[in-house]
């Protein structure tokens, strides 16, 4: 399959913006350059006229729980631990594989329609999440969440390992797998060491929640005499590739550890704000060389999966927190949501930029609209002015999965109907 995108304003993220074409063959970008300069030997099977559109790499949602779309609006305005123990965990105990499948498809629709092409997910019944990903056409890094203090901890680890063996590299390479220890307060050091050993054997990374709340910091300090970051260093977790969600409360020593170990951080500003967890020291992390991407967290604590809005929030929150309007400029935020996210997930050799050799994950934004005019700076427009409705066309791995805001891979009405029924049944059963 050969696809040609013509006459777009291209923001490749790597290198300067230009007006031109992007040519794709067998899912890979083979040309990105000025209009009319595509090699004469390239014969497109399909051509998209992107006049009046901006082309960017697909957005990368570095941390979410896709099936929790089913709990959107169910448990709001509560502290994190009360939210988990009183509301979320009881209803999660009722979830079936079918429930998680429909919740994940609902999340997939929402992500595609807001420009996300790749997401990192930690949950359970992950075979059904992977099935949804395969069907809807997204790219994803998936892991089974592991609770070390549970009576089923060993079984969960075995299931997590089996999931990796089944799905890592599946869906024509669109699905990658990790192991997912939930957090230091649910996974004691002895259990974490088992997870680390398994990740070494399977040669995959780890996805964990770290330093999210002050309560977590105080609990870990009381139990182990150190910060969660220092505890992870001591257990050997950081000897493996790690995706650390949140990292809100960090000392300078913590930041140095993250930088030295090459830990990837998923910054989730809206979830952190909604749960009053705090403001992550993103500026200090970036200055120290920590890899930072952007995530939404789950729709139960955000309450959407809108990476367009998340970019704007990330930029504005750091400016007001630092008292400095120059920090996190638009171009850097867009980079964090694309190439930066790819680095955090260990996928930088495949996605994140519009360069020859990369997989063709492309978003076309319709910009000939009042709120995106005049065209002084499209990078700034995407961060400060655009909305999810401006996403017109989405391409994943060279396949057009949404055109004119219509998702082509699944029936949207069926997904909405099934998700609504599922969510109502769950809440009525609690």
From Swiss-Prot:
Keywords attached to this Swiss-Prot or TrEMBL record, sorted alphabetically, are: Hydrolase, Metal-binding, Zinc
Q: Which domain of life is it from?
A: Bacteria
Q: Name one GO molecular function term.
A: 5'-methylthioadenosine deaminase activity
Enzyme Commission code(s) on record: 3.5.4.28, 3.5.4.31
A Pfam family that the UniProt record links to this protein: Amidohydro_1
Q: Which InterPro entries match?
A: Amidohydro-rel, Deaminase_MtaD/DadD, Metal-dep_hydrolase_composite, Metal_Hydrolase, MTA/SAH_deaminase
What does the entry list as the binding residues for substrate? Answer: 92, 144, 182, 212, 297
Q: Which residues bind Zn(2+)?
A: 63, 65, 209, 297
Which reaction is this enzyme known to catalyze?
S-adenosyl-L-homocysteine + H2O + H(+) = S-inosyl-L-homocysteine + NH4(+); S-methyl-5'-thioadenosine + H2O + H(+) = S-methyl-5'-thioinosine + NH4(+)
Free-text function comment from the UniProt entry: Catalyzes the deamination of 5-methylthioadenosine and S-adenosyl-L-homocysteine into 5-methylthioinosine and S-inosyl-L-homocysteine, respectively. Is also able to deaminate adenosine.
Family statement: Belongs to the metallo-dependent hydrolases superfamily. MTA/SAH deaminase family.
The identity of this protein, by name, is: 5-methylthioadenosine/S-adenosylhomocysteine deaminase
Q: Gene symbol?
A: mtaD
């Amino acid at each position: 399959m050969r696809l040609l995108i013509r006459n777009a304003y291209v923001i490749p993220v790597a290198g300067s913006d230009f007006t031109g074409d992007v040519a794709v063959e067998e899912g890979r970008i083979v040309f990105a350059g000025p209009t009319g300069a595509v090699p004469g030997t390239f014969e497109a099977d399909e051509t998209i006229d992107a006049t009046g559109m901006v082309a960017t790499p697909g957005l990368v949602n570095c941390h979410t729980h896709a099936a929790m779309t089913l709990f959107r609006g169910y448990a709001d305005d509560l502290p994190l631990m009360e939210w988990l123990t009183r509301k979320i965990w009881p209803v999660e105990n009722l979830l079936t594989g079918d429930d998680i499948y429909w919740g994940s498809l609902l999340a997939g629709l929402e992500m595609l329609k807001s420009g996300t092409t790749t997401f990192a997910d930690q949950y359970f019944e992950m075979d059904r999440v992977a099935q949804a990903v395969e069907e809807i056409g997204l790219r994803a890094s998936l892991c089974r969440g592991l609770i070390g203090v549970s009576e089923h901890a060993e079984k969960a680890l075995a299931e997590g390992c089996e999931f990796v063996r089944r799905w890592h590299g599946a869906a024509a390479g669109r699905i990658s797998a990790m192991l997912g220890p939930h957090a230091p307060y649910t996974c004691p050091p002895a259990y974490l060491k088992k997870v680390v050993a398994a990740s070494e054997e399977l040669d995959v990374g780890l996805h964990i929640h770290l330093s999210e709340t002050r309560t977590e910091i105080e609990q870990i300090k009381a139990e182990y005499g150190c910060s969660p970051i220092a505890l992870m260093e001591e257990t050997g977790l950081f000897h493996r590739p790690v995706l650390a969600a949140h990292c809100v409360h960090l000392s300078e020593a913590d930041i140095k550890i993250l930088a030295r170990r090459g830990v990837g951080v998923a910054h989730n500003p809206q979830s952190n704000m909604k749960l009053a967890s705090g403001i992550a020291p993103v500026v200090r992390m970036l200055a120290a060389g920590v890899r930072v991407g952007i995530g939404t967290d789950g729709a139960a604590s955000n309450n959407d999966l809108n990476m367009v809005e998340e970019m704007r929030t990330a930029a504005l929150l750091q400016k007001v927190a630092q008292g400095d309007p120059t920090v996190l400029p638009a171009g850097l935020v867009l980079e964090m949501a694309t190439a930066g996210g790819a680095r955090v997930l260990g996928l930088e050799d495949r996605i994140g930029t519009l360069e020859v050799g990369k997989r063709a994950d492309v978003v076309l934004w319709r910009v000939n609209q009042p709120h995106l005019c005049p065209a002084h700076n499209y990078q700034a427009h995407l961060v400060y002015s655009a909305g999810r409705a401006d996403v017109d066309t989405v391409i994943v791995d060279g396949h057009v999965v949404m055109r004119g805001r219509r998702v082509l891979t699944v029936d949207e009405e069926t997904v909405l109907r099934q998700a609504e029924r599922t969510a109502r049944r769950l809440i009525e059963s609690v």
